[in-house]
Each structure stands twice: as structure tokens, then as C-alpha cells.
């Protein structure tokens, strides 16, 4: 079940018809038998299959919404990979919060995501991104969805490390195993 904002609008826009087919789904399942029974939803408009990326762009344009922060395909993939590495075991809200930290730093520092990921010492691992990580990137960077209205920029996992520096910043919230902070001003 997808949790991205786009799926909410897929069903609310009302200009697309939905066709559910029980065939092999392009998702990882536990067995070939489970794969065969997995429903796969196709969306159509005027008899043509709809590319969801085009739908979100069209919906946003029609609604007068601009993407909050335009990403290249390579940046989108790399951020999703980092979310998978940094917050793969966290709930969706945790992935949103980590993506929000990256976005906030991009906007505050005026730098691109690749520089944020390098300078701010995000994980150097780049695993295959999960669907949730891809959706979190879309929700945060395209639609401006955030986990908090506070401008969080930093986080760490206390179970994995101690960080006096993080704790010297302004604590905002904890989501599962991560503590999130906004920048302390002097």
C-alpha cells in the first residue's frame, strides 16, 4: 500500500478511471503464488495508460502548485538511497523527517543535495531505495510535506552513537530511533 501524497490525489482528482488487474505485480513478494494474486492497479484517461509522474505534474500545475524544490532524477535517486540507508527501518514519518533535514539544509545553505549529503556526513552507503523512501522524497521535495513545522536540519540515532554536538542544538522531536534538532542560534 503506497503512502505517498500522490496516491491520495490519484483517487480524489476524479478525472482518471481505475482498472485493477490480478496478474503478476511489479513488487517483491514472498512467493511466486503470492505474486500471481497480487492486485496491480493501472490508471487510464481516454483509454491510455497514465504515467503517474505526469499526473502529479499536471495536477500540481492545475492546482497552481509549484514543486517546492526541483530535483534532477539523479538527485532524487541519491536522496532516496540515503533515506533507505539512514532511516530504512524507521516508520514513514521518520523518512519524511530525514528528507526534511536534507531539504531544509539545501534551502538554508543554498546548496544542492549532493553537497548536503557530502558535507553533512550522511551515510555513504547507496542501497537500492525502498518505495517508501522514493515516496518520502516526492512528498517532501515536490509537495512540501513535512514531519514538523520546525526547521529541522540535524538528526542522529542515540542507540548507535553519542553526540554532544547534536544535543547542543535545539531539540525538536524524536521519531522512533532518531532525535531531530533545529540549528541553535547564538
Name each model-derived stretch.
Residues 10-66:
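Membrane-proximal envelope biogenesis segments
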Amino acid at each position: 500500500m503506497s503512502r505517498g501524497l500522490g496516491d491520495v490525489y490519484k483517487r480524489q482528482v476524479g478525472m482518471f478511471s481505475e482498472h485493477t488487474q490480478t496478474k503478476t505485480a511489479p513488487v517483491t513478494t514472498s512467493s511466486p503464488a503470492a505474486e500471481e494474486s497480487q492486485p496491480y492497479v493501472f490508471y487510464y484517461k481516454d483509454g491510455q495508460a497514465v504515467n503517474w509522474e505526469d499526473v502529479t505534474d499536471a495536477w500540481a500545475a492545475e492546482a497552481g502548485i509549484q514543486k517546492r524544490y526541483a530535483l534532477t532524477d539523479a538527485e532524487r535517486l541519491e536522496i532516496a538511497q540515503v533515506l533507505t540507508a539512514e532511516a530504512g527501518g524507521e516508520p514513514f514519518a521518520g523518512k519524511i523527517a530525514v528528507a526534511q533535514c536534507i531539504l531544509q539544509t539545501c534551502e538554508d545553505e543554498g546548496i544542492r543535495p549532493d553537497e548536503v549529503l557530502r558535507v553533512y556526513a550522511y551515510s555513504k552507503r547507496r542501497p537500492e531505495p525502498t518505495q517508501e523512501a522514493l515516496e518520502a522524497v516526492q512528498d517532501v521535495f515536490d509537495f512540501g510535506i513535512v514531519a514538523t513545522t520546525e526547521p529541522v536540519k540535524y538528526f542522529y540515532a542515540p542507540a548507535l552513537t553519542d553526540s554532544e554536538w547534536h544535543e547542543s542544538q535545539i531539540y525538536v522531536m524524536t521519531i522512533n530511533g532518531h532525535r531531530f534538532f533545529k540549528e541553535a542560534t547564538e
